[in-house]
């Protein structure tokens, strides 16, 4: 499988600041990856510090003065990578409640809804379908600081909100789960996408309650507890405005066929 992905952003820097981007794909062992990444401020290239994190997360950090910053990223991935590695630390960390996936508020609720499926891969299908049936995908319906509880009460959200609710439900029934930002060929409307990963029967398996893109062609960008760990842009000082964002993600040939009951790993 060949996948071409990319992102173009234009950021107006209103006051000097420090920016961190997570738009570059994570390492994909045993695949062929070619990529380019540039940062241009008022026509002049600037350098970013690449910081490597857990799960292959790649943060590109820079201090920028007032001006207009253009970010251009493109990557081609040929083949599929190995399944995500497993560590005991991760299995502990991803059982815990986090800022946007408040699993501790769902313990009784999740046990009632999904208690019969806790020891089965059927759980993933049930949680995905449950979240998908409870929420409406409505761009602009949620705030960046909304968590899983807010999403369930609102009955609407975008991909990050679906992922947070899936993760919270899974953690609440003692299944390690985390959020992953991805490039998603076939997604409409095209954007950065967020999905959940759950640890079941020895593997990290992807769950996407939105059903907006086939899981088999997803490309991993960043992995973490919730959206706070995987944001494509973090601003740490001055004021900025995101004036443009275009995301692309395509496969060579037909998109894979997906079914909610299929067990899929991000590759």
What residue ranges belong to the model's regions?
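Hydrophobic/aromatic-rich core segments of domains that either
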Residues: 129, 161-241
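Generic structural "secondary-structure junction" signal
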Residues: 21, 64, 79, 116, ...
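Glycine-rich, small/acidic residue-mixed loop/short-helix segments
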Residues: 23, 27, 31-37, 211-242, ...
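Short, surface-exposed, polar/charged, turn-prone segments marking secondary-structure boundaries
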Residues: 34-41, 47-51, 66-68, 99-104, ...
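Residue-level signal for pocket-adjacent positions within structured domains
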Residues: 57, 90, 147, 202, ...
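Secondary-structure boundary elements
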Residues: 13, 71, 77, 81, ...
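Intrinsically disordered, low-complexity N-terminal segments that are enriched in acidic
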Residues: 1-80
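Short, charged, solvent-exposed linker or helix-capping segments at domain edges/interfaces
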Residues: 21, 83-89, 208
């Amino acid at each position: 499988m060949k996948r071409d992905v990319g992102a173009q952003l234009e950021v107006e820097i209103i006051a000097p600041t420090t920016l961190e981007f997570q738009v570059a794909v994570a390492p994909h062992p045993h695949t062929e990856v070619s990529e380019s990444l540039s940062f241009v401020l008022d026509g002049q290239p600037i350098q970013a510090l690449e910081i490597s994190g857990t799960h292959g997360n790649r943060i590109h950090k820079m201090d920028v003065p007032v001006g207009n910053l253009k970010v251009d990223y493109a990557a081609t991935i040929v083949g599929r990578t190995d399944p995500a590695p497993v560590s005991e630390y991760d299995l502990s960390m991803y059982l815990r409640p986090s800022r946007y996936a408040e699993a501790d508020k769902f313990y009784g609720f999740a046990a009632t809804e999904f208690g019969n499926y806790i020891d089965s891969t059927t759980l993933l299908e049930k949680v995905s379908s449950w979240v998908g049936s409870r929420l409406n995908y409505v761009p602009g319906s949620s705030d960046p600081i909304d968590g899983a509880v807010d999403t369930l009460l609102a009955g609407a959200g975008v991909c990050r909100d679906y992922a947070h609710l899936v993760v919270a439900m899974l953690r609440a029934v003692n299944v390690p789960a985390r959020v992953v930002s991805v490039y998603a060929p076939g997604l409409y409307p095209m954007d950065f996408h967020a999905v959940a990963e759950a640890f079941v029967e020895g593997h990290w398996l992807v769950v996407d309650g939105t059903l907006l893109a086939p899981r088999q062609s997803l490309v991993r960008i960043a992995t973490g507890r919730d959206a706070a760990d995987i944001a494509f842009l973090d601003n740490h000082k001055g004021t900025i405005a995101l004036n443009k964002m275009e995301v692309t993600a395509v496969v060579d040939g037909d998109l894979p066929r997906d079914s909610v009951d299929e067990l899929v790993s991000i590759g």
